[in-house]
From Swiss-Prot:
It comes from the Eukaryota. One of its GO terms (biological process) is female pregnancy. The keyword Signal applies. Its main location: secreted. Disulfide bonds join 44-51, 97-212, 229-234. GO terms for cellular component: extracellular space. InterPro entries: 4_helix_cytokine-like_core, Somatotropin/Prolactin, Somatotropin_CS. Belongs to the somatotropin/prolactin family. It is found in: Secreted. This is Chorionic somatomammotropin hormone.
Length: 236
């Protein structure tokens, strides 16, 4: 029987492709793996007691999800701006994200020179920082009349995949830096604005939330891509 850590890695791989249109390129390669999860995964055969999913595969999946979420977040920003952006004054558009307290590299070049341990912590902290905002955003969009179905679908998908992604990144982190403790993540305090009876207040809250989500999703993908290239290969 494969060890618990291997089972968690295998379960995460299967979770990536369940219940979503995401990762069509990965579905075929993982279908047999997921169907056979009661037995040893294909890469565990003849390796009883010491099986691990290849690190390259873990990074491939994580970066694919992160890239997908980043693109979805960008699409959400564009769709929201097209529908509501003109009704928001320039002063309200000033963005102060709740994750601004997390000190991140100022550029990709600076990120490339940042230690692995720090990049892992940044990714995990950023992902956890969006647990509550995404939950409330999806709830409010679902309960609001006139919400674009496409906008709601994108928000739901990002929420689902962000949860899967953070699990996967933690699996990778434990493989590379076992025993490493992560930093506390910032608390989101904009729920009252997101649920306000004032339509303008709500629109500004969603505007800021979507723009911050896009910013952070891009950072997450960039950091994971750097880690992948540094620790495995950039070719896939």
């Amino acid at each position: 029987m494969a060890p618990a850590s291997s089972h968690r890695e295998h379960q995460w791989t299967c979770n990536l492709v369940r219940g979503s249109r995401l990762l069509l390129l990965l579905v075929v390669s993982n279908l047999i793996l997921c169907q056979g999860q009661a037995q040893h995964p294909p890469y565990c055969r003849n390796q009883p007691g010491k099986c691990q999913i290849p690190l390259q595969s873990l990074f491939d999946r994580a970066t694919t999800v992160a890239n997908y979420n980043s693109k979805l977040a960008g699409e959400m920003v564009n769709r929201f701006d097209e529908q509501y952006g003109q009704g928001i004054n320039s002063e309200s558009k000033v963005i102060n994200c709740h994750t601004s307290s997390i000190t991140t590299p100022n550029s990709k070049a600076e990120a490339i020179n940042t230690e692995d341990k720090i990049l892992f912590k940044l990714v995990i902290s950023l992902l956890h920082s969006w647990d509550e905002p995404l939950h409330h955003a999806v709830t409010e969009l679902a309960n609001s009349k006139g919400t674009s179905p496409a906008l709601l679908t994108k928000a739901q998908e990002i929420k689902e995949k962000a949860k899967v992604l953070v699990d996967g990144v933690e699996v990778i982190q434990k493989r590379i830096h076992p025993g490493e403790k992560n930093e506390p993540y910032p608390v989101w305090s904009e729920q009252s604005s997101l649920t306000s009876q004032d339509e303008n207040v709500r629109r500004v809250a969603f505007y800021r939330l979507f723009h911050c989500l896009h910013r952070d999703s891009s950072k997450i993908y960039t950091y994971l891509r750097i880690l992948k290239c540094r620790l495995t290969s950039c070719e896939t």
